[in-house]
Curated annotation (Swiss-Prot):
Catalytic activity, EC: 2.9.1.1
Catalytically driven reaction(s): L-seryl-tRNA(Sec) + selenophosphate + H(+) = L-selenocysteinyl-tRNA(Sec) + phosphate
Organism annotation: Campylobacter fetus subsp. fetus (strain 82-40)
Record's signal peptide: none
Cofactor(s) listed: pyridoxal 5'-phosphate
Protein name per UniProt: L-seryl-tRNA(Sec) selenium transferase
Similarity remark: Belongs to the SelA family.
Involved pathway(s): Aminoacyl-tRNA biosynthesis; selenocysteinyl-tRNA(Sec) biosynthesis; selenocysteinyl-tRNA(Sec) from L-seryl-tRNA(Sec) (bacterial route): step 1/1
Gene Ontology MF terms: L-seryl-tRNA(Sec) selenium transferase activity
Length: 442
């Protein structure tokens, strides 16, 4: 038995085997060590060969590869796919930001004074140009924005929230829990399906700091229901001398096609309606990097900047550089550089051209049909819009697994597996054809 164990390959020799030439060496060594230790602990008999060991290491390494971040082809049709990284960034915008991200910069350095500067100054200026707000601030995500705003203005004070807006977002993060941890005191008003202006008005007292309106971006209440508009809330808070805050979740610029803008708040219009402070995610409909964008009155933003917690939530030069390029693309009307918006605006005929190109060049049996999809990212949950799908013959679950194995993430609809071209980029088409034909040759 010991003789058999002595024949096991040496750890330091494994990376040199031809089977492992392109493997990530540190992980390979760690995984190989675990595999060899397991073989020894199980007292494998003398029949184990070097090839058996290599196969065991390969299988174990495959598990590591599954968790390693890698590019995927999103063929689900959901453009802002939370599990697939939300909004993709344009390669052109990344190129424009690369030099700044890889150099020293005046991130917090005043070129005119030679002293410490404001890291948010340039981004704030761009956001003021884009939205017409008084001032702006950036933190690392919208949950951080909610926390910072509540902690700054409502610590140990009451915040009025409609029961119909006490939402839970992804990963079990709930508005009531965020409020509790921020130091704010939640005061629920109205009912789940109906909240009236009088509910807010009758609940304001000397300990009320603000009214928080939470946009129902990842669910909707239909039927016998009503809510109070932010315009009416703004008038009430101004009259009663308290703040109003709109947690928008996902903000967009201008308009959206396919009637997606209907009943979906537009950031610029909200600013004009008299909202004191707004926050939303940078990597949802805005189509940029993960961050929390806060817009509001100058004195309120200044108070947020003076909160010591901001240092824990601040963003780095990488985030600011990419965000700046995104905002400039909007200001220059280079909307084709905002990848999610570009995909949303594609016509059915454009998507059909892509689908036909794939169908005409693959060996698997499939058909093109019109379908419907959703924007995703916790936005517009009840608003589907048209798309084009390539539907494949055969067992849907087996097809889904096979495509996923090769990095193409599709979806199943009515017991058929399909690739939805609403979320497929033009430069993915050739790769999709190559992958599908490779699968069919197996």
């Amino acid at each position: 038995m010991r003789k058999a164990m002595n024949k096991l390959p040496k750890i330091d020799k494994i990376p040199n085997l031809k089977e492992f030439q392109n493997y990530f060496k540190p992980a390979l060594l760690d995984i190989s060590k675990s595999v060899l230790e397991e073989i020894r602990s199980k007292n494998q008999n003398e029949t184990i060969s070097e090839q058996d060991v290599i196969n065991l290491i390969k299988n174990a390494y495959a598990k590591f590869q599954n968790i390693e971040p890698k590019p995927l082809i999103n063929a689900t049709g959901v453009i802002i796919h939370t599990n697939l990284g939300r909004s993709p960034i344009s390669e052109d915008l990344i190129k424009q930001a690369t030099h700044l991200m890889t150099s020293y910069s005046n991130l917090e350095y005043g070129l005119s004074s030679g002293k410490r500067g404001d890291r948010y100054a340039y981004t704030s200026y761009l956001l003021k140009l884009l939205f017409g707000c008084e001032d702006a601030l950036i933190v690392n995500n919208n949950a951080a924005a909610v926390f910072l705003i509540l902690n700054s203005f409502a610590d140990e004070k009451e915040v009025l929230v409609s029961r119909g807006e006490l939402v839970e977002i992804g990963g079990s993060f709930r508005v009531p829990e965020v409020m509790k941890n921020s130091g704010a005191i939640l005061k629920e008003i109205g009912t789940t399906n109906k909240t009236h202006l009088s509910d807010y008005e009758n609940s304001i007292n000397e300990n009320t700091a603000m009214i928080l309106k939470v946009h129902k971006s990842n669910y909707d209440i239909v039927g016998f229901s009503s809510e109070v508009s932010i315009n009416d809330i703004a008038k009430l808070t101004q009259k009663r001398g308290i703040l109003n805050y709109y947690d928008l979740g996902s903000g967009y610029v201008n308009t959206l096609p396919y009637s997606l803008s209907k009943d979906e708040p537009n950031v610029k219009k909200l600013i004009q309606s008299g909202v004191d402070i707004i926050s939303f995610s940078g990597d949802k409909l805005f189509g940029s990097v993960q961050c929390g964008i806060i817009l509001g009155k100058k004195e309120l933003i200044n108070k947020l900047k003076n909160n010591q917690i901001l240092r824990m939530l601040r963003v780095d030069k990488m985030v600011l550089s990419m965000l700046n390029e995104t905002i400039k693309a909007y200001l220059n009307k280079d909307f084709h550089l905002i990848k999610p918006i570009n995909q949303i605006y594609k016509t059915l005929s454009e998507l059909e051209v892509q689908a036909k190109k794939v169908l005409e060049n693959i060996k698997l049996e499939a058909s093109i049909k019109e379908t419907k999809t959703f924007v995703g990212g916790g936005t517009m949950p009840n608003k589907s819009y048209p798309s084009i799908g390539l539907f494949f013959k055969g067992n849907a679950n087996k097809n889904e697994f096979k495509f996923r194995k090769y990095g193409i993430i599709g979806r199943i609809e009515n017991a058929e597996f399909l690739l939805d071209f609403r979320s497929i980029f033009e430069n993915d088409i050739e790769n999709i054809i190559k992958i599908i034909n490779g699968m069919s040759d197996e």
